[in-house]
C-alpha cells in the first residue's frame, strides 16, 4: 500500500480508504472481518457517518476497532432531513454537537480524526451552514480536542459542477473535502482538484465506482455500459457510435472495470480513494488496482475524450 499526504492535516493516508456505509447491519461479523482485513492490508482511513444504517455502521465499526489506534476515522454530520437532493436543511449547532457526541460513543473513541458536514448540496445551504452556528460548533469541537480536522462533503447528484466546493475550498475554513470523481463524472478534476492543491486541502474521493443510485455503476462491463446507456437516454451523451457500441470499453482491457475505475481516480492528484469493500474478496479485487501502476496517459486521454462532457450523475 502506498500513502499520500492529506493536505494541510499532514496525515499520511493510504491510497485506498474504506467506505463503511453498508454491510454492518446485514452481516456485522463479516463487516468486522473485512475491517480487520482492510487494516492488515495497510489501509488506514475508514469513512462512516451517523446516518449510515441509522448509526449501526459506527457501532459495529467501533467494535471492530477496539484496541486499534493506528486507524484514522472520518465521520459526518448531515444537516438535512434525508440524503435526497431536495432534502430540507435542518442543521443546528446543538444537533451537530449531539451528533458528534453520539458518534464518539458508538465508535468507542474520545475523538474523531475528521468530521465532515455531510452532503452540502447548494450554495444557499453552504451559506447557512457557515452562518447558523454549525461551522462554529465544528471549530469549537476541534478546539476541545474531540475532532482533529474538519471539512465538508458534497452531493454531486445535485451539484455535478461542484459549485459548493469551488466556494468552500478557497475560504480556508476546511482542512478536508470529500468529492465525487469517477470516469463517468470527471468534472472535479478541473473544477476542484487544482483549488485543493493551491489551498493545501486534503481530498477524499467518494463514489469512484458508483453513479447516483449507489447501487450500480462501474462494477462490470454490462453495468458500466448500462450507465452509459442511461447517460445517452438523459441527453448527456449522443445516441450514436461509439456510445452505442457494445465494445465501447474494450480499450480498458485487460483491466476489469473496477480496476480501471480506481486507477483512473488515483492517476489524479488526490489524497485517497474511498471505496466500499463488503467482503475480503472485494478487498483483494480493489488492492489489485493499486499494484503496480495507474492508468497510462493515452487511456486517461481516451476516457476524457469519451466522457469528459458529462456534468451530472444518473440514477
Map each language-model feature to its residues:
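N-terminal binding-site loop/beta-alpha segment at the start of enzyme catalytic domains
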Residues: 1-75
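A general structural detector for well-ordered alpha-helical segments in enzyme core domains, enriched
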Residues: 2, 34-35, 57-64, 99, ...
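Conserved, mostly hydrophobic/aromatic
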Residues: 6, 18, 46, 61, ...
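Local beta-strand N-terminus motif with an aromatic residue
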Residues: 13, 43-46, 70-71, 112, ...
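Active-site beta-loop-alpha junctions enriched in small/polar residues
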Residues: 21-23, 49-51, 76-80, 117-120, ...
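Generic structural signal for helix capping and beta-alpha/helix-loop junctions
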Residues: 25, 55, 81-83, 124, ...
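Glycine/proline-rich, positively charged
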Residues: 29, 36, 40, 85-191, ...
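Structured C-terminal cap/extension of enzyme domains
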Residues: 39-40, 44, 113, 191-315
Amino acid at each position: 500500500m502506498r500513502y499520500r499526504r492529506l493536505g494541510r492535516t499532514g496525515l499520511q493516508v493510504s491510497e485506498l480508504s474504506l467506505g463503511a456505509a453498508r454491510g454492518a447491519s446485514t452481516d456485522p461479523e463479516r463487516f468486522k472481518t473485512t475491517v480487520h482485513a482492510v487494516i492488515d492490508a495497510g489501509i488506514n482511513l475508514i469513512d462512516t457517518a451517523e446516518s449510515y444504517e441509522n448509526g449501526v455502521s459506527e457501532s459495529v465499526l467501533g467494535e471492530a476497532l477496539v484496541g486499534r489506534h493506528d486507524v484514522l476515522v472520518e465521520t459526518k454530520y448531515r444537516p438535512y432531513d434525508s440524503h435526497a437532493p431536495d432534502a430540507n436543511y435542518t442543521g443546528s449547532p446543538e444537533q451537530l454537537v449531539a451528533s458528534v457526541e453520539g458518534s464518539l460513543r458508538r465508535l468507542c473513541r474520545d475523538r474523531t480524526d475528521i468530521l465532515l458536514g455531510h452532503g452540502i448540496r447548494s450554495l444557499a445551504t453552504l451559506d447557512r451552514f457557515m452562518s447558523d452556528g454549525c461551522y462554529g460548533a465544528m471549530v469549537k469541537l476541534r478546539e476541545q480536542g474531540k475532532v482533529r480536522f474538519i471539512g465538508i462533503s458534497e452531493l454531486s447528484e445535485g451539484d455535478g459542477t461542484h459549485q459548493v466546493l469551488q466556494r468552500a475550498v478557497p475560504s480556508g475554513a476546511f482542512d478536508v473535502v470529500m468529492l465525487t470523481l469517477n470516469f463517468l463524472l470527471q468534472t472535479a478534476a478541473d473544477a476542484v482538484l487544482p483549488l485543493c492543491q493551491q489551498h493545501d486541502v486534503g481530498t477524499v474521493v467518494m463514489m469512484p465506482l458508483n453513479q447516483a443510485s449507489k447501487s450500480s455503476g462501474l462494477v462490470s462491463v454490462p453495468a458500466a455500459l448500462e450507465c452509459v446507456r442511461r447517460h445517452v437516454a438523459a441527453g448527456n451523451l449522443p445516441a450514436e457510435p461509439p456510445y452505442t457500441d457494445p465494445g465501447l470499453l474494450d480499450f480498458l482491457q485487460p483491466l476489469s472495470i473496477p480496476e480501471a475505475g480506481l486507477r483512473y481516480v488515483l492517476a489524479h492528484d488526490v489524497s485517497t480513494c474511498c471505496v466500499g469493500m463488503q467482503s475480503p474478496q472485494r478487498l483483494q479485487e480493489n488492492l489489485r488496482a493499486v499494484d503496480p501502476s495507474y492508468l497510462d496517459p493515452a487511456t486517461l486521454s481516451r476516457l476524457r475524450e469519451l466522457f469528459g462532457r458529462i456534468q451530472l450523475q444518473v440514477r
